[in-house]
Amino acid sequence: MLTIYSDDHRLHHGRHELIGGQFTPCFEKPSRADMVLDRVKAVGLGEVRAPRDFGLEPIRRVHSEGFVRFLQNAWQDWLATGRSHDMLPIAWPTRRLRQTEPDNIDGRLGYYSFDAGAPITAGTWQAITSSANVALSGQSELANGARSVFSLCRPPGHHAAADYMGGYCFFNNAAIAAQAFLDRGAGRVAILDVDYHHGNGTQDIFYDRADVLFTSIHGDPRFEYPYFLGYADEKGNGVGTGYNFNYPLAAGSDWATWSQALQAAIRQIQAYAADALIVSLGVDTFKEDPISQFRLDSPDYLRMGEAIGKLGLATLFVMEGGYAVEEIGINAVNVLQGFEGVHR
């Protein structure tokens, strides 16, 4: 399987995030992607290739012009205030507040985010545009006839919506790739999000559309981040009704429980008859992940890949979460190897 990867991810390395009421060193760090790449090479998964540059237009097909412009200029605007530490928001436009973009950089930072878990640094812009290009390069390979590609994206993307960032995510790589499939002639695209945390951004982007099916298996939002989307009764809106399927599971869920939700999602994908499948590949479902509470073990990821491979769809794997750094490479590549063992 071809892997698309860029060293530019290392340019984004936030020092702290706000979690559990404390500023904590970021769990989302460069060593995550480095460990996955090392495993890709160690098992001989296939060629590793740098991404092409697709410019900003494919990103603007998903993200608002104001949001893209904010991210492009954020660091320079921050420096202009005399500050050079990482950017984190302090206020958000919640219920009954005006939804008007402020002029002040701190106000804009809150306006375009939903939490304090996506620090912007000097290298963030280059890293996030490269991450989007990693996804777009994988999509392009599939559009040109490849049957499967691994886009080793970092930073991840599935918490980012059209006009907000959060949860380590800035541009929604999976959504950008899905839109690119449609723009190149696909009629229907399915997204399967297997990250422990609900892909709220991806759901938000496609919630009122029928040309993208979104399925997600994740921790119950009554108790788990991101809390405010991911319930089973969220089925889509308008013409998108019936094209959104959430499978929230209790803390402690193991493979026996998790795999039942996977089979339910697979049935929806089969019925949808998609032209392509995008897997938002988070492996923070692992039993030793420091910020998640499922109980999957490393061999379970082989079985996960096999189940996805049996769909027989042209498939793009887009890297999302996974914070047990020593095992992230083993678990992510197990999915890919399990997939390759059965995919035709």
Curated annotation (Swiss-Prot):
Binds 1 zinc ion per subunit. Induction: By exogenous acetylputrescine and agmatine, but not by putrescine. One of its GO terms (biological process) is polyamine metabolic process. The record marks Y323 as: Polarizes the scissile carbonyl of the substrate. Zn(2+) binds at D195, H197, D284. Disruption phenotype: Cells lacking this gene show a markedly delayed growth with a slight hint of increase after 15 hours using N-acetylcadaverine as sole carbon source, and display an elongated lag-phase of approximately 6 hours before growing on N-acetylputrescine. The deletion mutant strain exhibits only marginal changes in biofilm biomass in comparison to the wild-type. InterPro entries: HDAC_PDAC (IPR050284), His_deacetylse (IPR000286), His_deacetylse_dom (IPR023801), His_deacetylse_dom_sf (IPR037138), Ureohydrolase_dom_sf (IPR023696). Keywords: Hydrolase, Metal-binding, Zinc. Pathway: Amine and polyamine metabolism. It catalyses: N-acetylputrescine + H2O = putrescine + acetate; N-acetylcadaverine + H2O = cadaverine + acetate. It is an enzyme of class 3 (hydrolase). Its cofactor is Zn(2+). It comes from the Bacteria. The active site is at H159. Its EC number is 3.5.1.-, 3.5.1.62. Homodimer. Catalyzes the deacetylation of acetylated polyamines such as N-acetylputrescine and N-acetylcadaverine. Plays an important role in the metabolism of acetylated polyamines in P.aeruginosa. Is involved in the degradation pathways of N-acetylputrescine and N-acetylcadaverine, that allow P.aeruginosa to utilize these acetylpolyamines as a carbon source under glucose starvation. Shows nearly no activity against N(1)-acetylspermine and N(1)-acetylspermidine. Can also hydrolyze artificial trifluoroacetylated lysine-derivative, and to a lesser extent, acetylated lysine-derivative. This is Acetylpolyamine amidohydrolase 2. It comes from Pseudomonas aeruginosa (strain ATCC 15692 / DSM 22644 / CIP 104116 / JCM 14847 / LMG 12228 / 1C / PRS 101 / PAO1).
